[in-house]
Regions:
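Active-site-adjacent structural elements in enzyme catalytic cores
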Residues: 1-228
Length: 228
């Protein structure tokens, strides 16, 4: 628990649910049955939860107001397709996301983030999508699909739809695969390669919680995809 998902929710030791931010979510009967069953793969999984008893997603506008929608993922994906910038709460902090094929919005993100030249990384749905944009060696594929989910620099294909504004004047593109369920859902629903860059203004610390993100990123993001 020195790093990774557990580190982002633990507040004290030992690593038990009452010592994590999951303590405020009471398990429903189905989740509790899984948790108590030694034969279940979720036996004593401290963050065990489901859509009925676990954390909830919420979409907010740039001022932090709730956006009414029956499907948060579908609405957020549509906004990305429309060229909006969304601050997404991930593991340990926020990311700023936009359509990596849209030069206008990528340039706007650079302007708002005050990062005019440094290359940006993208996230794509899977290894097949990666190969549409980059030449991928066997070693690079192993790195991409490893549990660490690193950003891997790979040679950019000339016919890639990822716009040049992502990494101006460079032959290599930084690519990562989804490493949380939320990322997987967004990438699947949007069918886009997405710029994923740290949720901060250049040289500032990354935003960690909802209130801080709304306060510091309201001039950078058009919407916020958060959870409780």
């Amino acid at each position: 628990t020195n790093c990774g998902p557990r580190f982002t929710i633990i507040e004290d030791i030992p690593y038990d649910r009452p010592n994590t931010t999951m303590r405020s979510f009471t398990m429903c009967p189905e989740c509790l049955a899984e948790y108590d069953n030694p034969l279940d793969r979720r036996f004593h999984a401290q963050p065990n939860a489901c859509s009925k008893c676990g954390p909830r997603l919420e979409l907010l506008d740039a001022k932090g107001n709730h956006v009414e929608t029956s499907d948060v993922i579908a609405t957020a994906s549509q906004l990305l397709k429309e060229g909006k910038i969304i601050a997404i709460k991930g593991l340990g902090g926020f990311l700023l996301a936009c359509d990596a094929t849209n030069a206008r919005v990528v340039k706007l993100l650079r302007q708002r983030k005050r990062r005019p030249f440094k290359p940006l990384a993208i996230m794509v749905a899977d290894i097949d999508e990666t190969k549409r944009h980059c030449h991928v060696s066997e070693t690079e594929e192993k790195l991409l699909t490893s549990p660490q989910s690193p950003i891997v620099l790979m040679r950019w294909k000339p016919d890639s739809k990822v716009c040049q504004a992502v990494a101006p004047n460079l032959k290599y593109l930084g690519v990562m695969l989804p490493y949380t369920p939320l990322h997987h859902l967004l990438l699947k629903e949007s069918s886009l390669p997405l710029v994923m860059t740290s949720g901060n203004i250049s040289e500032e610390p990354i935003c960690q919680d909802n209130d801080e993100a709304i306060r510091r990123l309201s001039g950078s993001a058009d919407y916020f995809l958060v959870h409780n």
